UniProtKB/Swiss-Prot annotation:
Keywords: Ribonucleoprotein, Ribosomal protein
Gene coding for it: rpsJ
Organism in which the protein naturally occurs: Nitrosomonas europaea (strain ATCC 19718 / CIP 103999 / KCTC 2705 / NBRC 14298)
Assigned GO CC terms: ribonucleoprotein complex; ribosome
Keyword Ribosomal protein recorded: yes
SUPFAM superfamilies cross-referenced by the UniProt entry: Ribosomal protein S10 (SSF54999)
Similarity remark: Belongs to the universal ribosomal protein uS10 family.
PROSITE patterns: RIBOSOMAL_S10
Molecular-function GO term, any one: structural constituent of ribosome
Quaternary structure and interacting proteins, as annotated: Part of the 30S ribosomal subunit.
Gene3D superfamilies the UniProt entry points to: Ribosomal protein S10 domain
Entry protein name: Small ribosomal subunit protein uS10
GO biological-process terms attached to the record: translation
Function per UniProt: Involved in the binding of tRNA to the ribosomes.
Length: 102
């Protein structure tokens, strides 16, 4: 796997989980001899929802809710077979979504 790059994109609602997972991936990749760029924090996506408090009247009275989606981007440059095997065996928390592109 020479002159290749693995791009890993992490997505989660909790920034503590995503940072912990990113550190775990970086340590695993470095331990197997690969070069890691990142984790790079991408802009947090904030979705806001306005909901009426009352079912009938009082349109001006509303509750506001938001969901924050945190993103991290990492590049693993020149990965070995050992690196790929170690990353596949890695056990990450359930709240972290992982996208891998070769």
């Amino acid at each position: 796997m020479q002159n290749q790059k693995i791009r890993i994109r992490l997505k989660a609602f909790d920034y503590r989980l995503i940072d912990k997972s990113a550190i775990e991936i970086v340590e695993t990749a470095k331990r197997t001899g690969a070069v890691v760029k990142g984790p790079v924090p991408l802009p947090t996506r904030i979705e806001r929802f306005d909901v009426l408090r009352s079912p009938h009247v009082n349109k001006t009275s509303r509750d506001q809710f938001e969901i924050r989606t945190h993103l991290r981007l990492m590049d693993i440059i020149d990965p070995t077979d050992k690196t790929v095997d170690a990353l596949m065996k890695l056990d990450l928390p359930a709240g972290v979504d992982v996208e891998i592109k070769l």
